[in-house]
UniProtKB/Swiss-Prot annotation:
Organism: Clostridium botulinum (strain 657 / Type Ba4)
Predominant subcellular localization, coarse grouping: cytoplasm
Record InterPro entries: ATP_PRibTrfase_cat, ATP_PRibTrfase_CS, ATP_PRibTrfase_HisG, ATP_PRibTrfase_HisG_short
Enzyme category, top tier: transferase
Keywords assigned: Amino-acid biosynthesis, ATP-binding, Cytoplasm, Glycosyltransferase, Histidine biosynthesis, Nucleotide-binding, Transferase
Swiss-Prot/TrEMBL domain comment: Lacks the C-terminal regulatory region which is replaced by HisZ.
Protein name, UniProt field: ATP phosphoribosyltransferase
Top-level taxon in the UniProt lineage: Bacteria
Subunit structure: Heteromultimer composed of HisG and HisZ subunits.
Any single Pfam family the record assigns to this protein: HisG
Length: 211
């Protein structure tokens, strides 16, 4: 049985992924009692798995370059970049959406001034407004994008919305929904050939429990 290396996004997706792993009998003991460890042996009679925790934006890189055979990461991260791997499964967890949000008085389709849009996801925002044939100025920021319209940096924001509580608490509202997003499983292209049986087993077993 060949070893399969899995790169998992730290944080919220990590906890939900553990539940899925347990459901298909992957050994998660080390992962649940991890301390400061970053690499975990999840081997048992059914699987030979090594798992490591990384930041969301790094999951794709580990998978693309073959340091990981499989990755679990949000669709938001996949949409923002352009890397080479197979996207094989929608895990139906970590569900939220991309949306345009602004102060209630803002109208996206009114006025002739070029709109300023603050976002952590410039590529996603650019493509969205391109399809709407709107010429906007994108302002990339890494912190709380909700501040943009409040302090006058931007007219609106493009960001991930889960419950909408953060928007409401800061006096903002969703103007338009862009798309639904969720966690996805990605696979290194070479691994799909060299470790096909092991990878397909994991994909199929997870597919069964998330239906």
């Amino acid at each position: 049985m060949k070893k399969v290396k899995i790169a998992l996004t730290k944080g919220r997706l990590e906890k939900k992924a553990i539940e899925i792993f347990k459901a298909i009998n992957i050994n998660t003991r080390e992962l649940e009692d991890k301390g400061r460890k970053l690499i975990f042996n999840c081997e048992n009679e059914e699987y030979n798995i090594e798992l490591f925790l990384v930041k969301a934006k790094d999951v794709e890189t580990y998978v693309e370059y073959g340091a990981a055979d499989i990755g679990i990461v949000g669709k938001d991260t996949l949409m923002e970049t352009d890397k080479e791997f197979y996207e094989v499964l929608d895990l139906n967890m970590g569900k939220c959406k991309f949306a345009v949000a602004a102060l209630p008085s803002f109208k996206l389709d009114q006025g002739y001034n070029r709109k300023k849009i603050a976002t952590k996801y410039p590529n996603i925002a650019r493509e969205y407004f391109r399809k709407k044939c709107m010429d906007v100025e994108l302002i990339k920021i890494e912190g709380s994008v909700e501040l943009g319209p409040i302090v006058g940096l931007a007219d609106a924001i493009v960001d991930i919305v889960e419950t909408g509580n953060t928007l409401r608490e800061n006096g903002l509202a969703v103007v338009e929904d862009i798309c639904e997003i969720s966690a996805r499983m990605i696979v290194n292209k070479a691994s799909m050939k060299t470790k096909k049986d092991e990878v397909i087993k994991i994909v199929e077993n997870i597919s069964e429990v998330i239906r």
